[in-house]
Amino acid sequence: MSIALLGLDNSAVSTNLDDADYLERELDLLWKEQDSAGKKIFLTRVNQRLPELEYLFRDAASPLDLHWTLLAAISYQESHWNPQAISKTGVRGLMMLTQTTAKEVGITKRTDPKQSVVGGSIYLQKLINNLPESVPRQDRLWMAIAAYNLGFSYLTEARQITKKMNKDPENWDDVREILLFLTKNSTDHLMKVRIKEAVNYVQKVQLYYQTLSVIKRDKEI
């Protein structure tokens, strides 16, 4: 059985599920360039926190064109699956929604786990839908996730600049390249930090999503 994962490099993913060491080997490959402490914390929270929340991600993803492990990955990046999480800027809850976003998606209590996950999933789907249908599905997904962190207007501006620089505004890798280029040429320190955070945000979500996909598929086999 193949373990092809949406939009990610699967060259290192084994198809030999009879190998007893398969899961450990795949996780080692996925995290080989990552902080080992971060891996340990993530896997610990997969065991300790995710079981109580998994049904929320599954339920929220079900009516949408999303997979529950993707919502779970975004939530981990946002809050480490802590329903009471709050940032210095005032965003809070499992999906770290702003007050404005919460109102937009009909959420009244951001620290309520179910409301937060439902609200975050609706908001993500809106971001996906706001991108042109001509953008390939995988690229729309990564761009929407970048916009979840950075803001849709900044993503739109980055795509416009990508086109002006003769790159493909419908390809996430090209847009990401331009975002990083902008950080080298901007005098706005705060914006440089935000852009770098957004690019790193997508990379982390991809890592957590791929890790969860490997773990959960292994358990379902």
Task: Pin down the residues of each PLM region.
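Secretory-pathway/luminal and periplasmic proteins that interact with or process carbohydrate-rich
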Residues: 79-88, 127-130, 150-165
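Catalytic and substrate-binding regions of cell-wall glycan-acting enzymes that process beta-1,4-linked
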Residues: 18, 22-30, 144-215
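Substrate-binding/active-site groove segments that recognize
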Residues: 84-108, 115-126, 181, 205
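N-terminal export signals and maturation junctions of secreted/periplasmic proteins
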Residues: 2-58, 83
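Short, solvent-exposed mixed-charge patches
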Residues: 220-221
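Second-shell loop/turn segments in exported
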Residues: 40-48, 57-62, 82-85, 103-113, ...
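Extracytoplasmic
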Residues: 52, 66-71, 76, 89-92, ...
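Short, functionally critical alpha-helical segments immediately adjacent to catalytic or ligand/cofactor-binding
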Residues: 58, 65-82, 117-121, 144-150, ...
